[in-house]
Design a protein with these regions (language model features):
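Cysteine-centered iron-sulfur cluster-binding motifs in ferredoxin-type domains/subunits
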Residues: 1-5, 310, 426-440, 460-476, ...
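Iron-sulfur cluster-binding cysteine motifs and their immediate structural context
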Residues: 1-13, 438-449, 472, 476-483, ...
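Short domain-boundary/entry signatures in modular proteins, especially
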Residues: 8-12, 420, 451-458, 485-490
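Iron-sulfur-associated redox domains of electron-transfer enzymes in respiratory
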Residues: 9-416
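Residues immediately within or flanking Cys/His clusters that coordinate Zn2+
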Residues: 96, 155, 305-308, 422, ...
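Generic recognition of long tandem-repeat/solenoid scaffolds
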Residues: 267-274, 425, 459, 491-494
Length: 522
């Protein structure tokens, strides 16, 4: 699945830098909404700072040729997805509920563990999935660019986008031009990667003057902006769906849709589109998805539209974002969420269908949402991957019970609970959970000797925590090297059996009051 809050990403910056240095290449960077609300954290700016202009200026200073706004494609995704939703409701073209499809980790999770849901997933590509082929077709035509020279780069908060752009079917532009091997999007770099590149180049981010996006695919509505928040895709789509159903602008309540906003893992609402009443849900986190689907198994048909994101808070909490959440927790995510909602509220155009550059795109190229050309370039299909499990996917659909956490004056420990460990195959990267590694990897079929235990690590300086076979080469928060990391172990009191986790055992057992010498590492 998505390496949510991953220790580090597989870097692609060197490939992008090489393209920038190549005079035969035209480097186009498209920036996701959540990047501009978190990038400033990497340079010491206030949490939730909206740094869109500085972000564009930074990329221009790094030498890229064009900087475009993926919010433009978010508006495009809304038009396609809302149109598909209305068709499902009005004409029964596909089953309800319709699930969102813009989160690549959720898509792969559904393909692997819930293949029966695939007909319910919107076929609309994610904003990055739509931006790629549109740049290499429409944008290239308008500006007279050779699409073979274009290096399409997505700047995202998400590490799973690196997988998404390499899905076999993400080659619509190549098929359009009949150029085998051409990919829609060529590289993905995360917020952290971009910040590291800027630091390496000696850029003083805070002093940069704001710069605008390049024209043609740089306009976006407030609906595109809030795509980065959990509940944002739902709110944006409902604004357009209301217009599609009634022919009128949505009422004011649709521009601050409280029932779908917030940090609760599962939120539900009843929404009226004129005379049409829809039951909707917003979910983030795969464990919450399991819980929702298990609890609503017999009532799922009552819902019309369900948004799913895997990261906490949505894309603003993506695995490629600055790691401040390790220290500041949910408070930082809320700052980012509020920053995007503030930006939405500031814009004159808050509906995707009001985007004039997007109107021009449909008039001059796609024709209309869900047109034959739009279906070819902007929509996709999904693959049943459940065979990778080597067993019935149903056995993975039972929600796990979480163990709670206690905070003591000494350090954080967990209540006694599941002793399951995580193991990683050195060959294919498959992750297995169990007390011991599996006898055989279900993907590459190597035996248990090829598995390493995934451990937990804590930085002694800033208390950042992460998981990995080895500690990270550098702490993403305080930038100390791996020697500053200690393994977090499970400890058990020999007298009373009390269990806890920490770098060291507690000074005193809270149950039998024996000192730390009575604790053994398990």
């Amino acid at each position: 699945m998505c390496p949510v809050d991953s220790i580090t990403e597989t870097p692609e910056t060197e490939a992008v830098k090489a393209a920038v240095a190549d005079p035969d290449k035209i480097v186009i960077v498209s920036t996701s909404p959540s990047v501009r609300i978190a990038l400033g954290e990497e340079f010491g700016l206030t949490d939730g700072s909206f740094v869109e202009g500085k972000m564009v200026a930074m990329l221009k200073k790094l030498g890229v040729d064009y900087v475009l706004d993926t919010n433009f494609a978010a508006d495009m995704t809304i038009l396609e997805e809302a149109g598909e939703l209305v068709n499902r409701i009005a004409h029964g073209t596909k089953p309800l509920p319709q699930f969102t499809s813009c989160c690549p980790a959720w898509v792969k999770f559904a393909e692997t563990y819930y293949p029966d849901l695939l007909p319910h997933l919107s076929t609309a590509k994610s904003p990055i999935g739509m931006q790629g082929p549109t740049v290499k077709t429409y944008f290239a035509k308008k500006l007279g660019l050779d699409p073979r020279r274009i290096v399409n780069v997505a700047l995202t908060p998400c590490t799973a986008k690196k997988f998404e752009i390499r899905r076999e079917e993400m080659d619509a532009a190549g098929k359009y031009w009949d150029i085998p091997g051409m990919r829609d999007m060529d590289q993905v770099i995360t917020t952290r990667e971009a910040a590291a590149w800027a630091r390496e180049a000696g850029i003083d981010f805070a002093s940069l003057a704001d710069a605008p996006f390049d024209p043609l695919m740089g306009e976006a509505s407030g609906a595109g902006v809030i795509f980065g928040n959990t509940g944002g895709v739902m709110e944006a789509a409902l604004r357009t769906a209301y217009h599609e159903v009634t022919g009128k602008t949505a009422p004011s309540s649709f521009y601050d849709l409280e029932p779908v906003r917030g940090m609760e893992g599962i939120r539900e609402a009843q929404v009226s589109l004129g005379d049409l009443s829809l039951k909707v849900a917003v979910i983030y986190g795969t464990e919450q998805v399991r819980r929702f689907l298990a609890e609503k198994k017999d009532q799922l048909q009552e819902y019309a539209f369900i948004e799913v994101m895997t990261c906490p808070g949505g894309c603003i909490g993506g695995g490629g974002q600055p790691k401040g959440t390790q220290v500041k927790g949910e408070k930082l995510l809320v700052s980012r969420i509020r920053g995007l909602y503030r930006r939405d509220a500031q814009l004159a155009k808050r509906n995707s269908y009001e985007n004039q550059e997007l109107q021009m795109l449909y008039r001059d190229f796609y024709g209309a949402p869900l047109s034959e050309k739009a279906e070819r370039l902007l929509h996709t299909h999904y693959t049943d991957r459940s065979s990778l499990l080597g067993c019935d996917a149903g056995s993975y659909q039972v929600p796990r019970e979480h163990t709670g956490k206690i905070r003591t004056g000494y350090e954080e420990v967990t209540k006694p609970g599941n002793k399951t460990r995580k193991w990683k195959c050195r060959i294919c990267g498959y992750i297995y959970e169990g007390e011991q590694p599996p006898a055989e990897c279900p993907l590459c079929h190597k035996d248990s000797s090829y598995f390493d235990e995934i451990k937990r690590w804590r930085c002694r300086i800033c208390k950042y925590e992460c998981e990995g076979v080895e500690p990270p080469a550098e702490c993403p928060v305080c930038h100390k090297d791996s020697s500053y990391f200690d393994e977090i172990k499970r400890w058990r009191c020999r007298i009373c059996g009390y269990e806890c986790e920490g770098v060291n055992p507690p000074a005193e057992c809270p149950v039998c009051h024996k000192d730390s010498s009575y604790f053994d590492a398990e």
